[in-house]
Every structure is written in C-alpha cells, then in structure tokens.
Amino acid sequence: MNQEKLAKLQAQVRIGGKGTARRKKKVVHRTATADDKKLQSSLKKLAVNNIAGIEEVNMIKDDGTVIHFNNPKVQASLSANTFAITGHAEAKPITEMLPGILSQLGADSLTSLRKLAEQFPRQVLDSKTPKPEDIDEEEDDVPDLVENFDEASKNEAN
C-alpha cells in the first residue's frame, strides 16, 4: 500500500462501527487566555510567590537589543530556580535605554557598549558635518556695502 495513503488513513478518526464513513479529527484552536490559564496552573504547582515593588525589568540580548517590561508582574520560586515575568514587553535598542540602564549592565555588556560608543560619535559627526557641495556661497545674509552712510548723515545735518 502507498505510504502517503496509509499516513492519511492513520490521521483520520473513525467514528462508529464497521461501514460508517470516516471523518476528520476536530482541530482544537487554543486561545491566549487558555494558554495563560495553563501557565498559571503550572506556576501554582511550583509554589511561586509574587514579588511586589518591581517597576521595570530589562533583558539584554546578545545583539544589542533590550526586552523592556514596564510595571511587570514578577513571580519567583527559589526552590525550582524559576522566575516568571508577565506583562507588556517592548523590544528596544540599547542606545534608547541609556543612561538609565548603565547600572544594570554586566561586564560583557559594558564591552559591547564601549564598541557602540566608539561608533556613535562617528555617526553623529558624519551626519552633522556639511559636505562641500552642500555649502552655497551665494546665500550670504549680509549685503554688500555700496555707499558710505557717514557722508549722507553729515550732509543732512548741514
């Protein structure tokens, strides 16, 4: 028998007795709330405790981006060595988070930050210095002096 046909037959569910029509398996679509409930029940099994008073959580990735949670819900189970952080997450570049994130950086992150700092002034200088072809000499705001105004005022006074 053909392997594809056999796999197709195995994937189908047979309801009823001999001679009944085969029908497809029902696909169960999971929602985010169902996943969240399942996650919370798993966390309850680990006996997690809520940690209050955490204003922000920053997770620094190797590529220089930061996953930033503002006012997250943090739960921890020290016996299982598990921390759960839930809330709205934003992916931001590390340069956007400076200087507030400096105290949170480790040694490896500081070396990557130094490399970023070396590249940053070059980019700023390159963008700020005007190119010679962009400078237009005819756009002087000061007009050329044509007459001598001192002589005109002396003539009016006489």
Swiss-Prot record:
The keyword Acetylation does not apply. Pfam families: NAC. Residues 123-158 are annotated as: Disordered. The modification N6-methyllysine is found at residue 5. Keywords: Methylation, Phosphoprotein. Coiled coil: none annotated. Residues 134-150 have a biased composition (Acidic residues). Residues 33-98 form the NAC-A/B domain. The modification Phosphothreonine is found at residue 111. It comes from the Eukaryota. PANTHER family: TRANSCRIPTION FACTOR BTF3 FAMILY MEMBER. Belongs to the NAC-beta family. This is Transcription factor BTF3 homolog 4. It comes from Bos taurus. The gene is BTF3L4.
